[in-house]
Amino acid sequence: MEMIKFGQDDIENAMADMGDAQIDDLAFGAIQLDETGTILAYNAAEGELTGRSPQDVIGKNFFKDIAPCTDTEEFGGRFREGVANGDLNAMFEYVFDYQMQPTKVKVHMKRAITGDSYWIFVKRV
């Protein structure tokens, strides 16, 4: 399997060829959302970071139900703007603190190469 690096320019290309088990094996969190923020996929690394089971979060809204601390202009605003413009590609640092110990992370948002979905990649800093 090809090594996927957090923040790599073509990460959306690599993700398109990966199955669920390979996505779970990533060394960083990977959350796939639809345009409204509904969670389509949530890998094991993200579950370990947040203490949430992937099975419990799929189908819920990321910004409203799972991580309301991200429903800010800095995070959710970037997501909505990128979706509206069709060119989501942002990388920034953030602190997750909803129902967990405050944790500084690096976030990389990218539009998926196929379909109408979007990836949020998360790595502890």
Curated annotation (Swiss-Prot):
Residues 23-86 form the PAS domain. It comes from the Bacteria. The modification S-(4-hydroxycinnamyl)cysteine is found at residue 69. Coiled coil: none annotated. Pfam families: PAS. The 4-hydroxycinnamic acid (p-coumaric acid) chromophore is covalently bound via a thioester linkage. One of its GO terms (molecular function) is photoreceptor activity. GO terms for biological process: phototransduction; regulation of DNA-templated transcription. Belongs to the photoactive yellow protein family. This photoactive protein is a photoreceptor with kinetics similar to that of rhodopsin. This is Photoactive yellow protein. It comes from Rhodothalassium salexigens (Rhodospirillum salexigens).
